Amino acid sequence: STTATLMGRVAWEQMISDDTMLGYFVGGELADSNISGAFEGKQTRVAATAGGYAVRALSETLFADGFISIGAGRNNLEMADDVLALTSDYTTRTATVGGALTGAYAYERYELRPEMAFSYGKTWIGDVGFTGVAYGLTDNTLSVDAGTVSTASLTLRPEIVWALDAETVADSNAQLSFAPRFICERTTTATTTQNCGAGAEIGLSSNSEDGLSSANIRFVMDRVGKSNRSNVVFNVEHRF
């Protein structure tokens, strides 16, 4: 299956001390997925999110951050096999918390940024109603209780960042990054599964001369358990 997601977010940040920043945000999400397997089809999702985060400098080279977010989404699902076609509209609610410890060690034209991150998210799906069509007959009384889905993950990610247009990463407006990734996940639905795996990511970022705008693109590939995942993430940010 493949998914394309467009996200927008507005955030407000303030320094509450010399080494601590607090922020909060509101945002929206539009996602479109193609489903493959025994049933094939598509799913669209429109969602709204809100949350807060904090970043604290524990020392000159060690930083801690944490976040919490909540969201609600409306989903439209269409899928079918050779006999049965199913459609559904349903609402989900999600809550996520997480945090990370990140180091920053400068070595002339590159920096080493080891990171250990943890996140836990839970999605409430509940009863999902379906309309089914087969052999010219329609049944709109179909339903399934999907319950909840929770996922906990731990990621170790030693990132290396190179300066492309200056002698140090801090002075560079263009940067190249690479990071191997080591991941363990625990997913709970009606049953619980645990898997670990590894992957890698490569990124390219660019900042404006005034430091108010930035853009970056990242390519991520992971193998966790028997699942292969690949992502392309493009991000644009502007500070007012």
Predicted regions and their residues:
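Membrane translocator/pore-forming domains, dominated by Gram-negative outer-membrane beta-barrels
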Residues: S1-F240
